[in-house]
């Protein structure tokens, strides 16, 4: 998802043309969302009925808990979880149901990160139950954002090396500072190295929340991989060994049961599903956003984006996406954990939750549903201690910087493209000594109008 206060994202893409060169990516995003603003008429489905604008259902004690977490310093919260901050009934409210499925939080995740989200998105509390303010790209983000940026870079002779895995960084001493002087890597399995010159800089994307992901198929379930089934985590472990200033990857890699979930993409050649969901929800594809199936044992949610979702998508094909947060619980219609289900079984469960029975056989026959198991997809949300995430430019290094979801940036929130772009901008401006800083994080909590709207909304929807 995107929203209007992703200032680093829009700053970067304000100079990147779309693939057709008609306008900048930033302008395209704002133009598109002006044309089709998100306004859900079916944020939750419960008991076979759509709930258009669910009441938050918070008690005064719950609201006081939110206010306390929002105001408590991060140092005092420490490595405690969200569950440590609230009574169990909080996690039965519509507010939590919508918050956790929109952002993929679990009760055992970091209370510090939850606090950051509360502050970062204070301006979205009013209207959150209809997803007001959430923005989308015209196509999927790869076609709408990654490809234009890659094209712009390639035109400026940036080289992209594929099928290459960096295995180690050799850190030497240079005037009392650590300096990367060699990069070890494997290209198609063959070891090699790059010598780093005195005027060279090394910027590393640290860790990966999509590392070791695996795909299933229509008739097979994805496997659950681990941190050694890829290079991102092993690289971080190697360079951080004995160097506390480079962080502690084990804080994010060693609790897969707390960081995994399953997503799926369904490709449909029969228009029945989209027609039925459109008629049921009252939203056209691309308008409503996330639909959470509140009764689902898997806590499954789906999104029907505007079609076509991919550049070059055939006219007779429609695509939607979904995911589940409780992937180890048996389904309500398919008595298997979501993590053990094939694509056909996942789609069968979704059809059952939506009470689509008459057309189910035809939809299943003409669809391909691909499940994806992502063991580390919410690893950036896991409880952490100070120092587990290194600084963008680690203390005592001369030519090294980190980017991505696992370096430390004050105030901003992970699991966003904004965090990645902010870290990259911080790395470049710092390493090269540029007289620039990234746009400041928007802090709506200091705007009295924003606070009043949020306060009013929360208290109007109490139980």
Go through the PLM ranges and name each one:
Residues 1-21, 26:
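Glycine-rich FAD cofactor-binding loop and adjacent beta-loop-alpha segment at the N-terminus
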Residues 122-137, 195, 199-201, 206-422, ...:
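C-terminal segments that line or cap access tunnels to active or ligand-binding sites in enzymes
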Residues 162-182, 186-189:
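A conserved short coil-to-beta-strand element within the FAD-binding core of flavoproteins
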Residues 19-123, 135-136:
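Rossmann-like flavin
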Residues 114-127, 150, 161-165, 170:
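Catalytic cores of nucleotide-enabled group-transfer and carboxylate-activating enzymes in metabolic
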Residues 1-6, 131-154, 160-165, 336-339, ...:
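Short beta-strand to alpha-helix junction loop
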Residues 8-15, 98, 144-155, 345-353, ...:
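Amphipathic alpha-helical segments that form well-ordered structural scaffolds
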Residues 430-463:
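Active-site-proximal substrate-binding core of FAD-dependent oxidoreductases
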């Amino acid at each position: 998802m995107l929203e209007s206060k992703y200032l680093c994202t829009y700053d970067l893409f304000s100079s990147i043309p779309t693939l057709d060169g008609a306008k900048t990516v930033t302008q395209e995003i704002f133009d598109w969302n002006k044309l089709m603003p998100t306004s859900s008429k079916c944020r939750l489905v419960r008991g076979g009925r759509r709930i258009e604008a669910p009441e938050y259902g918070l008690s005064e004690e719950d609201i006081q808990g939110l206010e306390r977490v929002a105001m408590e310093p991060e140092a005092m919260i420490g490595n405690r979880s969200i569950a440590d901050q609230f009574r169990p009934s909080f996690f039965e409210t519509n507010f939590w149901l919508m918050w956790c499925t929109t952002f993929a939080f679990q009760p055992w995740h970091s209370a510090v990160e939850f606090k950051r989200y509360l502050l970062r998105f204070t301006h979205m509390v009013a209207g959150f139950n209809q997803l007001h303010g959430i923005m989308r790209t015209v196509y999927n983000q790869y076609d709408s954002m990654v490809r234009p940026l890659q094209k712009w870079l390639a035109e400026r002779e940036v080289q992209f090396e594929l099928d290459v895995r960096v295995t180690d960084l050799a850190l030497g001493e240079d005037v009392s500072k650590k300096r990367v002087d060699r990069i070890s890597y494997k290209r198609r399995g063959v070891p090699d190295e790059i010598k780093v010159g005195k005027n060279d800089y090394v910027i590393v994307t640290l860790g990966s929340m999509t590392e070791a992901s695996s795909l299933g198929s229509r008739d097979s379930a994805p496997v659950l991989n681990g941190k050694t089934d890829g290079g991102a985590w092993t690289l971080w472990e190697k360079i951080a060994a004995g160097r506390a200033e480079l962080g502690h990857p084990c804080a994010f890699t060693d609790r897969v049961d707390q960081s995994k979930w399953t997503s799926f993409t369904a490709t449909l050649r029969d228009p029945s599903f989209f027609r039925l969901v459109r008629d049921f929800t009252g939203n056209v594809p691309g308008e409503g956003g996330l639909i959470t199936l509140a009764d689902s044992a898997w806590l499954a949610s789906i999104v029907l984006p505007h079609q076509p979702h991919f550049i070059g998508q055939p006219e007779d094909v429609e695509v939607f996406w979904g995911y589940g947060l409780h992937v180890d619980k048996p389904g309500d219609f398919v008595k298997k954990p979501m993590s053990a289900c094939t694509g056909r079984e996942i789609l069968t469960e979704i059809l059952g939750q939506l009470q689509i029975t008459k057309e189910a056989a035809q939809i299943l026959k003409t669809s391909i549903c691909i499940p994806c198991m992502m063991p580390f997809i919410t690893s950036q949300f896991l409880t952490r201690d100070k120092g587990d995430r290194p600084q963008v430019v680690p203390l005592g290094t001369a030519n090294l910087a980190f980017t991505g979801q696992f370096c430390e940036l004050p105030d901003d929130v992970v699991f966003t493209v904004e965090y990645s772009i902010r870290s990259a901008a911080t790395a470049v401006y710092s390493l090269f000594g540029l007289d620039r800083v990234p746009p400041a994080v928007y802090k709506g909590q200091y705007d009295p109008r924003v606070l009043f709207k949020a306060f009013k909304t929360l208290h109007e929807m109490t139980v």
